[in-house]
Curated annotation (Swiss-Prot):
Family: Belongs to the ku80 family.
Gene Ontology BP term (one): double-strand break repair via nonhomologous end joining
Its job: Single-stranded DNA-dependent ATP-dependent helicase. Involved in non-homologous end joining (NHEJ) DNA double strand break repair. DNA-binding is sequence-independent but has a high affinity to nicks in double-stranded DNA and to the ends of duplex DNA. Binds to naturally occurring chromosomal ends, and therefore provides chromosomal end protection. Required also for telomere recombination to repair telomeric ends in the absence of telomerase. ku70, of the ku70/ku80 heterodimer, binds to the stem loop of tlc1, the RNA component of telomerase. Involved in telomere maintenance.
Region of interest called Disordered, as start-end residue ranges on this chain: 277-299, 567-586
UniProt catalytic activity: ATP + H2O = ADP + phosphate + H(+)
Annotated EC: 3.6.4.12
Biased composition (Basic residues): 567-576
Protein name: ATP-dependent DNA helicase II subunit 2
UniProt keyword Hydrolase, yes or no: yes
Gene Ontology, cellular component aspect: chromosome, telomeric region; Ku70:Ku80 complex
Species of origin: Emericella nidulans (strain FGSC A4 / ATCC 38163 / CBS 112.46 / NRRL 194 / M139) (Aspergillus nidulans)
Superkingdom of source: Eukaryota
Length: 725
């Protein structure tokens, strides 16, 4: 079970916090809230009911706290009691966090109030307690009863963090470790800084700058994972049921590496006609007419699956079948072979949970590409000294003999067995076996590719000098280029050393980018999502110094390899390009006496539309072709029996869109789709055809925007608005 946590954030919302300083676009309060929001949203993302938060506003216009009758506690408001934060609490707090019109309020009194909140909520139970104070160090601070405050913080084991903001001429608080020192500091503010620093030092807390804290929020937080054993059993050599000399060691198995997957999106529908918390009826599909703007009024979409079989005598030619009436069948060629549940149980392999050693192999003879799974560790059963000694002996034996063990693993009874490799791992204070799954014979894919250093002719002759083989100059140039791109660093003595890929500093861009986007949208539902943090993209490009160092080697490699730039693909209007000439060099059109097309036939609309555009000599011809296609599409919609012609309309409209993008006439298509949408929604084409409009939206056949054609006058926002209606 996760530890219980209670954190109280004290945020300075005084009048001075509404100012912008040091060239920042954000106010001091907005800048401070970047850190607070990051902490809060990370806690909310865990979904833990035992992770609770509280927020206190310092220097507020009014007073709202249980100690407000005393003068020292004026202009301090409890914005949120200690509780589990949800989406609604985030939105409510965002509306209340605003700069006030006063700079009155005692930070020390706010600290006392936070301690009181934690004592009241946590009592004497086992909790992780933390208080975070963010202030610019201005205003009056009461230095009385500091000994009592320090004593209470230590007694209740409360972690205290105090962060400063930026002042008028630079950082308010000095931080020698972070390279910050303010010159000509106001004596009153210097006194406040000394007071706050003294409190944190006596409480064994942290006193730092907000700039450092905000920068550290860019570093993704790796979620701690509580270890859960995937196997508890025996590592055994020999059959203990038949032989007394068999070896059995109680062991446990835990994951060492596991892919961390980003959160997945769930489907919801925006329902304004339902009360909060009320669910809609069960349905197989749900198509919302509008996109939800925030997290409110969302209803779960539940799918209903039905099974049907053909029956000519039934209405509609099909009848429903219950899931319990279904039988399993295995594909055999082009037919299905039925196997009943009774027979299927017989075919299953009966196994018992165990890890049985089947052999050993020299480490140098094992190929690393045989790894087939995540990595696990095998340790002795906890609190079993005899098992620890036995496993340690086995690990050291493998290490000294430079060998690996091969074992047959069954994690649970009657589960399919797997082959695993066991490798010794010995650290100064830790020993274990590293385990990876090995492939069976059917899992190995063996392919043979042509050799890279010689060519075998049809007659069987081996050729080492060939146009498809690199010569010595090319190999030398490539070697020097690769060497120049080698990652290197320096040790404590300044000597060059190879630096491996820093796993501890390489975070999953997809995982943390999705999490950051979710948190950003939760706080600011209408603002654009900020760009990804630099630490997530640092490995998307080689280091600058390596590129500069390898530049001359790359130029020589290009010269030796005779690399030539491929001419860019021709752009522009199709009619402006030269037509492709046949290999015969004959003019096929003149030989066939093909006349220019005037009318487009509804029975062969798409090919004839393309021919008309290819033969068009002016814009009027193209306009006429688009007009004819619009008429044909509207006739297909008007005379469609149900959705019989919807696919034809979608295909035809898609061809018109692609062709007009290629001919750089996006305006013609945009006029067409606007008129078609109006006719569909106003039911001018034979009744309610909204389902067709939904199909066109799903096929992304909306307006041509500027990203798709430079000549388009439609922006991305206009295109989205057009499709959302």
């Amino acid at each position: 079970m996760a530890d219980k946590e209670a954190t109280v954030y004290i945020v300075d919302v005084g009048k001075s916090m509404g100012e912008r300083r040091n060239g920042r676009d954000l106010t001091d309060l907005e800048w401070a809230m970047k850190y607070v929001w990051d902490c809060i949203t990370n806690t909310v993302a865990t979904g833990r009911k035992t992770a609770m938060l509280g927020v206190i506003g310092l220097k507020t216009d009014g007073t709202d706290n249980e100690l407000g009758d005393e003068s020292h506690f004026s202009h301090i408001s409890v914005l949120s009691e200690i509780k589990q934060f949800l989406m609604s609490d985030i939105r409510e707090l965002g509306e209340r966090i605003k700069p006030s019109s006063v700079d009155k309020g005692d930070a020390i009194s706010a600290l006392i109030l936070a301690i009181q909140m934690i004592i009241t909520h946590c009592k004497k139970l086992k909790w992780k307690r933390k208080i975070v104070l963010i202030t610019n160090g201005l205003g009056r601070m009461n230095s009385e009863n500091l000994d009592d405050i320090v004593s209470k913080v230590k007694e209740d084991n409360i972690e205290l963090i105090i962060l400063d903001l930026t002042g008028r001429r630079g950082p308010d608080f000095d931080d020698a470790e972070y390279g910050i020192k303010e010159e000509d500091k106001d004596p009153h503010k210097a006194s406040n800084e000394t007071l706050l620093r003294t409190i944190t030092e006596r409480c064994d807390g942290v006193f730092g700058t907000l700039e450092q804290a905000v920068e550290e929020t860019e570093i993704p937080r790796v979620k701690p994972v509580r270890p859960v054993a995937s196997f508890k059993g025996f590592l055994q050599l020999g059959n203990p049921e038949e032989y007394d000399t068999a070896v059995r060691i109680p062991v446990e198995r835990y994951p060492r590496t596991m892919v961390a997957k980003p959160p997945t999106a769930s489907q919801f529908v925006l329902r304004s006609d339902l009360a909060a918390g009320q669910e809609g009826p069960v349905s197989s599909t749900a198509v919302p007419e509008t996109q939800p703007e925030d997290g409110s009024n969302l209803t779960n979409v539940r799918n209903l699956r039905t099974y049907q079989v053909s029956d000519e005598s039934a209405p509609g030619g099909k009848i429903d079948v219950e899931r319990d009436d279904l039988a399993k069948g295995y594909e055999y060629g082009r037919t299905a072979v039925h196997i009943s549940e009774t027979d299927e149980n017989i075919t299953r392999l009966e196994t018992t949970a165990a890890m049985e050693l089947v052999g050993f192999i020299q480490s140098e003879r094992y190929d690393r590409y045989m790894h087939l799974s995540n990595t696990h560790i095998i340790i002795a059963n906890r609190a079993n000294d005899k098992a620890s000694l036995a496993l340690s002996s086995f690990i050291h034996a493998l290490f000294e003999l430079e060998s690996y063990a091969v074992a047959r693993l069954v994690t649970k009874e009657n589960k399919p067995p797997t082959l695993v490799l066991l490798a010794p791992s010995i650290e100064p204070d830790y020993e274990c076996l590293l385990e990876v799954q090995l492939p069976f014979a059917e899992d190995v894919r063996t392919y043979r590719f042509p050799p890279l250093d010689h060519v075998v002719t049809v007659s069987g002759k081996v050729v080492t000098q060939h146009r498809n083989l690199p010569n010595d100059d090319l190999l030398d140039a490539m070697d020097k280029y690769v060497d120049s791109m080698e990652l290197k660093g320096t040790d404590e003595d300044g000597d060059l050393v190879n630096t491996p890929f820093p796993i501890d500093d390489s975070f999953s861009p997809v995982l943390h980018r999705v999490n950051a986007a979710i948190r950003s949208r939760a706080i600011h539902p209408n603002d654009p999502i900020p760009p990804p943090a630099r630490i997530l993209t640092q490995f998307s490009q080689p280091p600058e110094h390596l590129l500069k160092n390898a530049e001359r080697h790359l130029k020589r490699l290009i010269e030796v390899a005779d690399v030539k730039k491929v001419p860019p693909k021709a752009k522009g209007r199709k009619r402006a390009r030269e037509p492709e000439k046949p290999l015969s060099g004959l003019d096929v059109d003149s030989l066939l006496h093909q006349e220019k097309r005037v009318r487009i036939s509804p029975n062969n609309a798409i090919p004839e539309f393309k021919q008309t555009l290819a033969q068009a000599e002016n814009i009027e011809t193209m306009k006429d072709a688009v007009k004819q296609m619009r008429s044909i599409l509207e006739d297909q919609i008007r005379h469609s029996l149900g959705d019989a012609n919807y696919d034809r309309v979608t295909e035809g409209l898609g061809v018109v869109r692609e062709e007009l993008i290629a001919y750089e006439e996006p305006g013609l298509y945009n006029d067409l789709i606007r008129k078609l949408k109006e006719a569909l929604l106003k039911e001018k084409l034979g009744g309610d055809q909204r389902e067709l409009w939904w199909l066109l939206k799903r096929s992304k056949l909306g307006l041509i925007e500027q990203r798709e054609s430079e000549l388009s006058e439609v922006t991305e926002e206009e295109a989205k608005k057009f499709m959302s209606a």
